[in-house]
Amino acid sequence: MNRPLLSVIVIAYDMSRQALNTLKSLAPSYQQNVNADDYEVILVENRSRRVMDAAAIASLPGNFRYFLRDEAGVSPAAAINFGFAQAQGQFIGLMIDGARMVTPGVIENVLMAFSLNENAMVCVPGYNLGEHEQQFHRSKGYT
C-alpha cells in the first residue's frame, strides 16, 4: 500500500458494538468516491471488559489497522499519541469518541478540503439521532 493521503485515528474504550458501527461507516464499501488506498483507519482500543470481537477485527478492510492497548489511567491521551505515531497519512483525522458514525461522503469531503489548502483545519460536526442526546439514550428507551 502506498502512503495514504489521510489517516483517521479512532479511539475506543468499552464500546465494542458502537466502535464496530463507527468502523463500518468509515469502510471503503460505505464511503463514496474514494479508494481504500486514499486513506487508512487506525483503531486504538484501550482494554476494557468489552473489547472488540476477534472475528469483527479479522473482517476489517485492508486499509484498517487495530491496536489493543493496556492503559493504567482513564485518559485517552496515551492512545491518541500512540495512534499519531502509527499514522502514515499526509493528513490526520482524530475521532476521540469511537461511538460516532459518519456520512458516506465524509472522507471524500475531507480530502477535498485538504486539496484546496493543505493547511486546512477540517472539523466534522456531530449530531444525535432522535429527540434526546446520546448520553441519555438508555434512560429514554433507546438501545
Residue ranges and their predicted role:
Residues 92:
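Short aromatic/hydrophobic "clamp" motif used to bind/position activated sugar donors
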Residues 96-100:
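The conserved acidic donor/metal-binding loop of glycosyltransferases
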Residues 104-142:
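Conserved donor NDP-sugar-binding/catalytic core segment of glycosyltransferases
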Residues 5-7, 40:
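Cell-envelope/extracellular polymer assembly enzymes that use nucleotide-activated donors
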